[in-house]
């Protein structure tokens, strides 16, 4: 047991060269923890507010000195003297002080950085790894589980400067025996894909999340390139490795139509659901994220009725890690999975609440990074602690992405036992 004696924050840079906030929580025992807030590019309209300065003379208006100031003044005054191990009380105190539904006063980035830094400090104080400390915060007895990585090896949409409409084309090494081997599968396929693209005379520059970002004639062309890379790397698509998509459909939903500009196609909700179903028939796709616009609930119902019994349908912009919105989805039988992003909701306690609600309803939970990341690896510990079973943390290059994979490898070695369950994490696969 140890009380907080100091909190400090600073403005640092994320993986896109934009400012973000880093916070330190220092305890009377001498233990401390530091954490950073990530930032998204394609964001849901109902996400908690990321407080930016808006001063165009600094960082093009994206500075976070207001959020830093809130940590160094209001939040510091609020939390100094409180017991660090009472995570719920710390988070609730910040939520009450903010007083808004979207954390618009103090800023979700300020609250989150402190919330995670406090958890890290408490873990150090108690001599526990972070995943063990987070696990202890939950009401149920989860067994640790190493998540199946969902590796984004072709980037499109808002994550790349190319003509590909679907935002993420991912591979999942479901046939690997360990997380270290899953990461090896992914790395080998990533390098094979580079060769495939080079052979076709395509660009092998990478996007925000480390995946390749070539101009391609269609979404199918991206899938075909990945299928070829899987084979060249010596793996079998559908058995060793499956595919996943993040459509980020809100980014190309215009006037009630899904407009694939790269393919010069425009579809209504039912037609787009049919399009996705056809892709699933042709390729071993077992997960689709944001297959409809966040406001197109009727479209989501169509998609869920069409694919929900055989494909994981993940709500990201749809649910924004918010239990109130997730409950509506559960009640209306929309989607069957939720993407979990710390900064969409803004505190560790609320994040754990969303994971629990999803699990209790039979929904899966996919722990996720953001496109604007740092070296912070907390999401790896969160995935293990909650036995979520799946993690999205980008491709197999860029140190901001690889840091999370390396953390998973270290955790697996620490646990010293098999905790990677591969395809068993996908109940729809049987």
From Swiss-Prot:
Major site of localization recorded for this protein: cytoplasm
Q: Which residues bind Mg(2+)?
A: 246, 289, 316
Keywords, ordered alphabetically: Cytoplasm, Glycolysis, Lyase, Magnesium, Metal-binding, Secreted
The chemistry this enzyme catalyses reads: (2R)-2-phosphoglycerate = phosphoenolpyruvate + H2O
Q: PROSITE patterns given for it?
A: ENOLASE
- Primary enzyme class: lyase
Note describing how the cofactor binds: Binds a second Mg(2+) ion via substrate during catalysis.
Pathway the protein contributes to: Carbohydrate degradation; glycolysis; pyruvate from D-glyceraldehyde 3-phosphate: step 4/5
- Obligatory cofactor(s): Mg(2+)
Q: Which SUPFAM superfamilies match?
A: Enolase C-terminal domain-like, Enolase N-terminal domain-like
Which Gene Ontology cellular component annotation is one that this UniProt entry carries? Answer: phosphopyruvate hydratase complex
EC?
A: 4.2.1.11
Q: What CDD domains is this protein classified in? A: enolase
Which SMART domains does the protein's record reference? Enolase_C, Enolase_N
Where along the chain is the active site annotated?
209, 341
Question: Which top-rank group of organisms is this from?
Answer: Bacteria
GO annotation terms (biological process): glycolytic process
Please give the Gene Ontology molecular function terms for this protein.
magnesium ion binding; phosphopyruvate hydratase activity
Residues annotated for (2R)-2-phosphoglycerate binding in this entry: 167, 341, 370-371, 392
Note the PANTHER family from the entry: ENOLASE
Q: Which family is this protein grouped under? A: Belongs to the enolase family.
The record's subunit annotation is:
Component of the RNA degradosome, a multiprotein complex involved in RNA processing and mRNA degradation.
Free-text function comment from the UniProt entry: Catalyzes the reversible conversion of 2-phosphoglycerate (2-PG) into phosphoenolpyruvate (PEP). It is essential for the degradation of carbohydrates via glycolysis.
Its name, as the record gives it, is Enolase
Species source reads Alcanivorax borkumensis (strain ATCC 700651 / DSM 11573 / NCIMB 13689 / SK2)
């Amino acid at each position: 047991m140890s009380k907080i004696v100091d909190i400090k924050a600073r403005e640092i840079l994320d993986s896109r060269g934009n400012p973000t906030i880093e916070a330190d929580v220092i305890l009377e025992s001498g233990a401390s923890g530091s954490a950073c807030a990530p930032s998204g590019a394609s964001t849901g309209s109902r996400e908690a507010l990321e407080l930016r300065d808006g001063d165009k003379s600094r960082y093009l208006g994206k500075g976070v000195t207001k959020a830093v100031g809130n940590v160094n003044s209001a939040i510091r005054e609020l939390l100094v003297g409180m017991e660090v191990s009472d995570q719920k009380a710390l988070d609730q105190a910040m939520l009450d002080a903010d007083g808004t539904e979207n954390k618009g006063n103090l800023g979700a980035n300020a609250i989150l950085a402190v919330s995670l830094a406090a958890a890290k400090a408490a873990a150090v104080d108690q001599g526990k790894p972070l995943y063990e400390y987070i696990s202890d915060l939950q009401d149920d007895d989860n067994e640790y589980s190493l998540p199946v990585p969902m590796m984004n090896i072709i980037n499109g949409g808002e994550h790349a400067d190319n003509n590909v409409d679907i935002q993420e084309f991912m591979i999942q090494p479901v046939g690997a025996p360990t997380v270290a081997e899953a990461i090896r599968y992914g790395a080998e396929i990533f390098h094979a894909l580079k060769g495939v693209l080079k052979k076709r005379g395509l660009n092998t520059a990478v996007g925000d999340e480390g995946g390749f970002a070539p101009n391609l004639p269609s979404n199918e062309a991206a899938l075909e390139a990945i299928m070829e890379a899987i084979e060249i790397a010596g793996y079998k698509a559908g058995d060793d490795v499956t595919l996943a998509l993040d459509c980020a459909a809100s980014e190309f939903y215009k006037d009630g139509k899904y407009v694939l500009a790269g393919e010069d196609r425009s579809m209504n909700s039912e037609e787009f659901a049919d399009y996705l179903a056809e892709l699933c028939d042709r390729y071993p796709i077992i997960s689709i994220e944001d297959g409809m616009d966040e406001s197109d609930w009727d479209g989501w119902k169509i998609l869920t009725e069409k694919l929900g019994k055989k494909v994981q349908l993940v709500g990201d912009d749809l649910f924004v890690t918010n239990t109130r919105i997730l409950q509506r989805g559960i009640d209306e039988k929309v989607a069957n999975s939720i993407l979990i992003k710390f900064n969409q909701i803004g505190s560790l306690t609320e994040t754990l609440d969303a994971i629990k609600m999803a699990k209790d309803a039979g929904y899966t939970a996919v722990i996720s990074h953001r496109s604007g990341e740092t070296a912070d690896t907390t999401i790896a510990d969160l995935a293990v602690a909650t036995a979520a079973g799946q993690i999205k943390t980008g491709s197999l290059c860029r140190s901001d992405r690889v840091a999370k994979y390396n953390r998973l490898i270290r955790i697996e070695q620490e646990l010293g036992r098999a905790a990677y369950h591969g395809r068993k994490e996908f109940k729809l696969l049987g």
